Amino acid sequence: MKKSKLSLLLVFSLVLSMFLAACSGGGDKDTGKGKTEGNKNAGKEEQLADEQVLNVLESAEIPTMDSVMAEDVMGFTMLNATNEGLYRLDADQKVIPGVADGMPTYNDDKTVLTIKLRQDAKWSNGDPVTAHDFVYSWQRAINPDTASPYGPYFMMGKIKNATEISEGKAKLEDLGIKALDDYTLEITLVRALPYIESYITFQLFYPQNQKFVEAQGADYAKDAAHLLYNGPFKMTKWDGPTATEWVLEKNETYTNAKDVTLTKINFNVSKDPQASANAFTAGETDITPKLAQAAILSQYEGSDELLRYQEPSIWWLKMNEKNPALKNKNIRKAIALSVDKKALVDDVLANGSIEADFLVPKGFAFLDGKDFRDTAGQWSKTNKEEAKKYWDKGLAELGVKEVAFTYVGQDTETAKTTDAFIKDQLEKNLPGLKLTIESVPFKIRIARENKYEYDLLMGGWGPDYADPMTYMDLWITGGEQQHMDYSNPEFDKLIKAASEDLVDKPQERWKALQDAEKILLEDDAAIAPLYQRSVNLLINPKVKGFAHHAFGADYSYQWIKITK
């Protein structure tokens, strides 16, 4: 993000406050006719309902509840509800202590953090949560044998010796996290990170009870019976990754259990937005999944049941360069320029989402009060004529007249509608292209992406911490989250500089990140950004204290109260 030569953390605090003001909406900024923040307010004078049970619909299953293996927002959100790390985000997006007993102390160059832990934090089986639980989980995340999808990506180049351990050149105990005693952690960084405090709120960094994990063996986290919890709620029902319903109940061993009012949350999966809206109207659910259908949303415009906010998540087309045709830059440029993004957001989504000709979202990152987007360019703007020229040139270079691609999409109704529009746009504007859509459950979509078993794929990304780098370093050569076989040494060089040499030179670092964005989107057309998403939920007005987050988990449920 932004740092000053005198004090990285001081400026980070200022930057984060600006980021939060832009992202959280602050209650005054309405991005639509629905209610943007009203359900966050507690309604101090309202009486509580006799039964504090919340019913929630979600649009996807939970692929895993193992915090070092989670790589999706459903997993992150459920982990956030049932567990707690050193720090968490509060309802106003501020970093607050979780298991930590206060904020970190730093050495002079901000590369060593010392964190005291609360001595009353407990696991749901009664065991104390100690510094050793954090050391174990962090080491497990970076251990090559674990094959964590996020561990190496998140830690390498940031936590001391993470890169060396991931590459088999150092031992696990060399990782830059030490238990000085049962309740004192020391974290050593490769270099100062201006966003370190928001960074370690992420679910990957949650503790794990080594004795329990190892006792479960291969069964660990396979269902609710093989999990421990140290957060606001515990799972009392979840049959594993294919389960379409699960139950959370208040965790009485949680440190701040006295502040948790809900006694139970019932979750069910609904992949049909109309069915979700019907269930809400019938009073069968209190909160729906994110809704995108204009026909549904139009019925609730102006209603206090509609919660709408712009989130810093970008959706794009990924292009797998293991396919020889997609290795061709002109073919990729043609695809990137051929989709009518305005029609997509206005006519298909029609939910407040905006066109994205960029990677780092609007209203997310600021330097000296200026939005990253205001000083960066806009890339891959829709241009069907140019797209056709690139397409013809690419086909000629490949020596073919037709190309067929497999497009892997999700099996929700919203995804199917969007995917059908993408197919129509590409086939209509790029003669000779045949696109076959395969709609699959979320877990399978992730698996196919990870195995490179796709040609085109609709992907998206929400930030994991408060800095543009959370979007940019995804695309470095060999990046753990890339799964496209993309590589550009100049891009890698700029990202490395922004991560290392320029960390205390905010203006130069900003320029490097913006130059890297241009290479990725304009020069190489490695991905095709489509839109920045607006979130629309239906939520019972009697539900107070519902909090949504700008990065990491989507929501927090622990502050919810149900009124009469």
Question: What residue ranges belong to the model's regions?
Answer:
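Structural transition elements
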Residues: 355-394, 414-416
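Surface-exposed binding/hinge segments that line
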Residues: 116, 135, 149-211
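Gly/Pro-rich hinge or "lid" segments in bacterial periplasmic/extracellular proteins
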Residues: 183, 189-259, 264, 274
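Ligand-site clamp/hinge motif
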Residues: 252-298
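N-terminal lobe/hinge region of extracytoplasmic solute-binding protein
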Residues: 57-108, 228
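Aromatic- and charge-enriched surface segment that lines or borders ligand/interaction sites
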Residues: 102-150, 186, 325
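Detector for C-terminal structural segments
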Residues: 338-368, 413-423, 448-564
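Alpha-helical secondary-structure segments
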Residues: 130-137, 182-188, 262-264, 282, ...
